[in-house]
Amino acid sequence: ELKNNLVTVRFRAKENIYKFLREGLQRYPSNQIRISKPDPKDSWKPISQSLKFFSLERIADDLFPYPIEIDIPNWTLKKDIDFKRWILGFRESILIESPENLVEEVKETYSNLNELYN
C-alpha cells in the first residue's frame, strides 16, 4: 500500500551536489532512492553494498549530468517543509524534472523571492 502512496521526485544535479548526495544516502530508505552512476573518470567508486543505489545513467556533456530519483510519500511532497527546504537549498545546482507540481512550486517560490528583493 505504501508503494501506491509514493511519488517520484526526479532531478538532475551538478557534480558538487551529486558528490554531496552520494555520501549521504541514509536520508531516504534504500528501496526509495536511485542515483546516477559516477563519471567513469571519477576515482571514487561506490562500495559494493551500495551499488544498487547507482542505477541511473549519467548524462554526458550536460550541465546537470547526474539524475537522481527519490520516491517519497505524497504527504511529504505536499506538506513537509523540511523536504522543500532540503530541495530548495540546492538552489541553481539542481534542475527538478518531476513531478510537475513541484517544478511549478519551485518556479513560483523563486519568482516571489526575485520580486521581493528586486
What are the functions of these language-model segments?
Residues 1-118:
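Polybasic (Lys/Arg-rich)
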